[in-house]
Amino acid sequence: MRKTITARLIWLPLCAMAQQWKANGMSAEEVTPKGWQYSVAEGDLNKDGVSDIVVLATPNHAENLKTRDDGYVYNFNTPELAIYLGQKGGGYNCWKTYDNVVPPRPDEYNSIDATISITPRGVLSISLEHFSSAGGWGNTTETFLYRYQGKDFFLIGEDEETMARNTGEAEKISRNYLTNRCQRIKYNVFNDKVKPKETWSKMKKEPLKKLGE
């Protein structure tokens, strides 16, 4: 079954949240709330010739932390995404911050590994790898591609790749919202003798969704 992500846009003055993101700064470390674990992607998102940064950070609010008997700490806080546009004179200004674009870890047995990157063409890629340590053999990775156009970021494509860890059977579904075409490939990770099966289909044309919708 295809997973969906419900995203809610948080856009407050100067990127303010319960614990504030800084309105501007010279680096990802400087703008990210202190103590939050974060990753950063760098590239030119708005095609102005100046490098921008996207920061994905997980809060450390104590009420959403749980310590295991062996000392390992589960973090159930919801990650936050912040986009900072580079300035020609140096540094970055906060453009928008988003809450719930990336879902939190659901429980002790299921995790979501989120990664962000910016392609050479300035497309923001958000990948979510769902992993279950108990109760199932399936792995799912979702990748969402957003492009800056018309003064906002719009979803232009997404991939969904599933794999059974016990059999190696896998399927990848790629949706292109610019061409309205869908590619589906079935293959086997463990057996090269199994020939991949590829099919294409048309999708209904719909308005592009904004990041955060």
Where are these regions (language model features)?
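N-terminal targeting signals for Sec/Tat export/insertion, comprising classic cleavable signal peptides
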Residues: 27-53
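Repetitive beta-architecture junctions, highlighting loop-to-beta-strand starts
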Residues: 38, 79-81, 141
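Blade-edge motifs of beta-propeller repeat domains
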Residues: 19-33, 88-108
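Acidic, small-residue rich beta-repeat scaffolds with periodic aromatic anchors
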Residues: 113-213
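Bacterial Sec-dependent N-terminal signal peptides
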Residues: 1-21
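Signature of short aromatic-glycine-proline-rich micro-motifs recurring in repeat-based ectodomains
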Residues: 36-40, 110-116
